[in-house]
Structures are given as C-alpha cells and as structure tokens.
Amino acid sequence: MKIAVLPGDGIGPEIVNEAVKVLNALDEKFELEQAPVGGAGYEASGHPLPDATLKLAKEADAILFGAVGDWKYDSLERALRPEQAILGLRKHLELFANFRPAICYPQLVDASPLKPELVAGLDILIVRELNGDIYFGQPRGVRTAPDGLFAGEREGFDTMRYSEPEVRRIAHVAFQAARKRAKKLLSVDKANVLETSQFWRDIMIDVSKEYADVELSHMYVDNAAMQLAKAPKQFDVIVTGNMFGDILSDEASMLTGSIGMLPSASLDKNNKGLYEPSHGSAPDIAGKGIANPLATILSAAMMLRYSLNRAEQADRIERAVKTVLEQGYRTGDIATPGGQQVGTTAMGDAVVAAL
C-alpha cells in the first residue's frame, strides 16, 4: 500500500514525522513517499501544488497531509498561496466528503473551555461537503457594481451554489455514517434566508426516505452554532455545506480542549482519502518541538480505517493514544494539573511505546 506523505509548512513536518514513526511501528509494511506541498511546494517549483506532488497523490492509496500556510506568503497572488494546495488536492482527487470527529477524552475534560458536565462523553461527527458552495461557486471576483444603491462603486461578490448530485451524494454519506452510530442525523442550513439552503433541505428530506431507520432533523446554522456551545452532547452526526461546515467544525473542535487532538478525513466516492489534523500550520511555534502530534497520529488511524482497510491497526493506534493520555503525558496545549508536559517527539515516542 502506497501512502503519499505531504508534510507541508510550519509545524507540518514535525507532526507528520511522529505519525510516520507510529505507522512504522505497526506490524505492516507501507510504501511511504514524501513530496513538498504548500509553501514548501512553492519554494520547490513555483506552485503550492507541484505537478509531481499531484501525480504522487493520484497514484497513492491514501494521502497523509500535515498543514500548509505561512505569513511570508501572504503577499502572493491568491492562486500561489500555500492554502491553494489543499483546495487543489480536493478538486483534482474529487474529495467531496469531510469527516471531522470532535471527541472529548475523559482525561482532557478539564481542558475544555466549557464545564465538564457539558462535554464529558462528547462524541460528535461533522460531515462537511467539500466541493461546492460559495467557496467554489462562479462567478466571483471584484468589479464595478452595475446597478443597485452603490452602482458605479467597487464591489466584491461570490456565488453560493449547489447541484442536486452534490447534495445527494453527501446526504448518502452522512446517512450511512449516522446509521453506524446513534441513527440520528442533523442537517444544518439557512433555509429561512437562502434559496441554496432550502434546496439543500428539500434534497435531504427526499434522501431520508431511503433511510427509515435514521432520524433526520434540521437546524439553522446560527442556532446550531449557539447550541454547540450551550448543549453540545445533543448532537451525534451533523451534515452541512462547505462554508457552514468549515465554521462549525472549528467551533466543535474547541469544545474538546484543543484542536491539536482532532483528526480529519476527506474522502472520494471510493473511500480514497486525504488525512490531516484539523489545526493549521502554526508558524509561530514551528521548529520549537512543542506542537501536539496526536491529531496527526489519529488522522493516520482514520487513514488505516477508511482507505486502507486496516481497522484493527487503527484501533491499536487509538487505544495507544488513550493510554498515553491516561499515563499523564501532555503537550502544552492540553496541559492539565499533575500531567507530565512533553514535546512533539516525546509524545510520538510515548504513543509508539504504548503500541
């Protein structure tokens, strides 16, 4: 099995190195091939997603991704910024379904900004559509307004758009995920204001007829954001569009105590996927050896489960992470009283030892 390893920028190389260390500790043989991406890709080829990197990603059975982005690239035109690499990979590999689990581990309940009773036992899965919505809708740009109250003035504009096939395929993915869990699915939209959201809701209701065993409910995105902070354990599986999912999944991540604990998977129709931590490249702490590698290690576990059909090995990694937390090992972002604070490498070593 071939895995494309794309460390990226900032803390990306440090945390990916620990995930690779864990993979190498398993009694499996993987072909791991590394390539530059993001700012590193731009430095190597003049583009954040070099042709050779894209070729490797297409040929691989799965992609293990670190993080991209650095302030020094902010002056580049949008098409050349590091963040375009992840958007390009999603587009070229047709990765349309993003899974973002938000789990509050018992050992970290005191690290959450919410009261322990609100987050103890929290286990949410957010299923986000990745290829449509306002992030990719056309037309978009900056122009002189042709009409309206500010005709003749400069304006920025984007297009929120979804096709029926896009909504149907993410609906099926979400219903199938809910079927394997508590058989509850919440669809989040803004159907009281947006035509696109009403269209989304209508299709969700139609698809639900094929999943009589799954309870479908709906919530407006503003209320969902409030409820995530007020009573998050009411949720199990949430399905939503690209922009709403981007925002809600980041909010949900903070309920757990640290975004440094949360993995993610982006899948195509055949379950080939790109696996990455939910956090960014954190250039402010790059090279200091203090980044939390657990989200990346858990992303590797998701990769084993969803794309490589190695569920037992995924379970082993997840159990090892729980063991390490029970033993009191903590990076700075999840530090708790009485815990043993360690750096990136030591945390990876602890997971390997727990295996």
Curated annotation (Swiss-Prot):
Binding, NAD(+): G280, S281, A282, P283, D284, I285, A286, G287, K288, G289, I290, A291, N292
Gene Ontology CC annotations of this record: cytosol
Pathway: Amino-acid biosynthesis; L-leucine biosynthesis; L-leucine from 3-methyl-2-oxobutanoate: step 3/4
Gene Ontology biological-process entries: L-leucine biosynthetic process
Transmembrane segment boundaries: none
Co-factor requirement: Mg(2+); Mn(2+)
PROSITE patterns referenced in this protein's UniProt entry, alphabetically: IDH_IMDH
Cofactor detail note: Binds 1 Mg(2+) or Mn(2+) ion per subunit.
SUPFAM superfamilies: Isocitrate/Isopropylmalate dehydrogenase-like (SSF53659)
Top-level taxon of the source organism: Bacteria
Gene Ontology MF terms in the entry: 3-isopropylmalate dehydrogenase activity; magnesium ion binding; NAD binding
Cellular compartments annotated: Cytoplasm
Keyword Plastid attached: no
Residues binding Mg(2+): D222, D246, D250
Keywords: Amino-acid biosynthesis, Branched-chain amino acid biosynthesis, Cytoplasm, Leucine biosynthesis, Magnesium, Manganese, Metal-binding, NAD, Oxidoreductase
Chain positions recorded as substrate binding sites: R90, R100, R128, D222
Residues flagged as site, Important for catalysis: Y135, K190
Entry function: Catalyzes the oxidation of 3-carboxy-2-hydroxy-4-methylpentanoate (3-isopropylmalate) to 3-carboxy-4-methyl-2-oxopentanoate. The product decarboxylates to 4-methyl-2 oxopentanoate.
Subunit structure: Homodimer.
Family named by the database record: Belongs to the isocitrate and isopropylmalate dehydrogenases family. LeuB type 1 subfamily.
UniProt name for this protein: 3-isopropylmalate dehydrogenase
UniProt source species: Burkholderia lata (strain ATCC 17760 / DSM 23089 / LMG 22485 / NCIMB 9086 / R18194 / 383)
Lineage: Bacteria, Pseudomonadati, Pseudomonadota, Betaproteobacteria, Burkholderiales
